[in-house]
Amino acid sequence: METLANRLDVCQDKMLELYEKDSNKLEDQIMHWQLMRVENALLYKARECGLTHIGHQVVPPLSVTKAKARSAIEVHVALLQLQESAYAQDSWTLRDTSREMWDTVPKKCWKKRGVTVEVRYDGDETKSMCYVHWRDIFTQNYSDDKWVKVAGHVSYEGLYYIHEGEQTFYVKFKDDAYVYGETGKWEVHVGGKVIHHHAFDPVSSTREIPAAGPLCTGDTTKASTETSVGATEGPQQKRQRLETLNWEQQQRQYPQTPSTQTTERASQPLDVTRTSDCDTTCPYTVGHPSDPDCAPVVHLKGDPNCLKCFRYRLHKGKRKLYCKTSSTWRWSCESENQAAFVTIWYTSYSQRNEFLSTVKVPPGIQVILGHMSMFV
């Protein structure tokens, strides 16, 4: 107990030094969140040992310290990734990297240079609400998870930013129009200017995509339909849809027999949960495991931030147990609140089995086995 108390004192003293230092360097904020992780880990261990007090400090319940530790890990990993970007030398204060800032809309982004926007519902000053418009928003690319800085915008419709050609609203004024008003109309006051309804020019998040030819012989009707859908998609949805179509084409070339499917299931570890997001009427089957053009993979499904943390740990300590990992991805038909995926690629089934028997997957992440065509 004495050792635990001493470690906790040292950890908290270092945190106080950082608060007094009031640094604007990113490395100091990373150290702060590292200490937050250590503090909650020590408190968790103390409670696990049956301690309710360490000196004059009350030890919180296990559920509280566990939640705080997970929160600290999430922010810490995000800052470590930010340190590898072009914005590592920018000014970053404790306020800029706080959990409250991380959870403020747009969530899971870093934000700077906030400006107050006043919205008067029904044009009545007594029915006004204030929102924060962030002029600088730091978000991650869909493809490689690199941090980029985009500009925030204000329109009659709401507050938004444009990233990789997609317009994302983090505040929509119409959601509050009938909460604070009655007519469903409002005025936007920002920077000494007023945006009225008649001045509203909605910005579309879609762009025209050049029509493509049929994907393969015999699929002309289907290809023309898919092309018309692609014309209204953003780059993320279009990219995911084309990958899906490419996957479906390859499955037609390598159909799997029922006997092969049974053999494959029998050869896989029993302690791994196998699931499928398709129903039993899905016309496409998994690629032939013995095909030289197929590679074994594991799809990890869960909360996107948990997946990023787990992928980061794999990259640091288990790099020899797999070939490569994908960025975090979602099906384009699902909302932002749905579970995300990370795909891990292996050079052989023995390497995948070694990975599954060695690496402990966090409880909140679901493991799905499969194969993928070796297209790269």
UniProtKB/Swiss-Prot annotation:
Chain spans, region Transactivation domain: 1-206
Alphabetic keyword roster: Activator, DNA replication, DNA-binding, Early protein, Host nucleus, Isopeptide bond, Phosphoprotein, Repressor, Transcription, Transcription regulation, Ubl conjugation
Top-level division of the source organism's lineage: Viruses
Entry GO terms, CC: host cell nucleus
GO MF, any single term: DNA-binding transcription factor activity
Presence of keyword NAD: no
Subcellular location: Host nucleus
Pfam families given in the database record: PPV_E2_C (PF00511), PPV_E2_N (PF00508)
Positions of region (DNA-binding domain): 294-376
Span list, region Disordered: 211-271
Family matches, as InterPro entries: E2/EBNA1_C_sf, Nucleotide-bd_a/b_plait_sf, Papillomavirus_E2_C, PPV_E2_N, Reg_prot_E2, Regulatory_protein_E2_N, Regulatory_protein_E2_N_1, Regulatory_protein_E2_N_2
Biased composition (Polar residues): 218-237, 246-266
Free-text description of this protein's post-translational modifications in UniProt: Phosphorylated.
Cross-link (Glycyl lysine isopeptide (Lys-Gly) (interchain with G-Cter in SUMO)): K301
Principal subcellular localisation of the protein: host cell
Any one Gene Ontology BP term: DNA-templated transcription
Sequence similarity: Belongs to the papillomaviridae E2 protein family.
Subunit details: Binds DNA as homodimer. Interacts with protein E1; this interaction greatly increases E1 DNA-binding activity. Interacts with protein L1; this interaction enhances E2-dependent replication and transcription activation. Interacts with protein L2; this interaction inhibits E2 transcriptional activity but not DNA replication function E2. Interacts with protein E7; this interaction inhibits E7 oncogenic activity. Interacts with host TAF1; this interaction modulates E2-dependent transcriptional regulation. Interacts with host BRD4; this interaction mediates E2 transcriptional activation function.
Role of this protein: Plays a role in the initiation of viral DNA replication. A dimer of E2 interacts with a dimer of E1 in order to improve specificity of E1 DNA binding activity. Once the complex recognizes and binds DNA at specific sites, the E2 dimer is removed from DNA. E2 also regulates viral transcription through binding to the E2RE response element (5'-ACCNNNNNNGGT-3') present in multiple copies in the regulatory regions of the viral genome. Activates or represses transcription depending on E2RE's position with regards to proximal promoter elements including the TATA-box.
Protein name: Regulatory protein E2
Provenance organism: Human papillomavirus 28
Gene name for this UniProt entry: E2
